[in-house]
Amino acid sequence: SHGSHETDEEF
């Protein structure tokens, strides 16, 4: 989503 580094949770 946002600035995911690995997956796409909330990072």
UniProtKB/Swiss-Prot annotation:
The keyword Chloroplast does not apply. GO terms for molecular function: metal ion binding. Pathway: Energy metabolism; oxidative phosphorylation. It is found in: Mitochondrion inner membrane. Keywords: Heme, Iron, Membrane, Metal-binding, Mitochondrion, Mitochondrion inner membrane, Ubl conjugation. In response to mitochondrial stress, the precursor protein is ubiquitinated by the SIFI complex in the cytoplasm before mitochondrial import, leading to its degradation. Within the SIFI complex, UBR4 initiates ubiquitin chain that are further elongated or branched by KCMF1. One of its GO terms (biological process) is oxidative phosphorylation. GO terms for cellular component: mitochondrial inner membrane. It is a peripheral membrane protein. Belongs to the cytochrome c oxidase subunit 5A family. Component of the cytochrome c oxidase, the last enzyme in the mitochondrial electron transport chain which drives oxidative phosphorylation. The respiratory chain contains 3 multisubunit complexes succinate dehydrogenase (complex II, CII), ubiquinol-cytochrome c oxidoreductase (cytochrome b-c1 complex, complex III, CIII) and cytochrome c oxidase (complex IV, CIV), that cooperate to transfer electrons derived from NADH and succinate to molecular oxygen, creating an electrochemical gradient over the inner membrane that drives transmembrane transport and the ATP synthase. Component of the cytochrome c oxidase (complex IV, CIV), a multisubunit enzyme composed of 14 subunits. The complex is composed of a catalytic core of 3 subunits MT-CO1, MT-CO2 and MT-CO3, encoded in the mitochondrial DNA, and 11 supernumerary subunits COX4I, COX5A, COX5B, COX6A, COX6B, COX6C, COX7A, COX7B, COX7C, COX8 and NDUFA4, which are encoded in the nuclear genome. This is Cytochrome c oxidase subunit 5A, mitochondrial. It comes from Canis lupus familiaris.
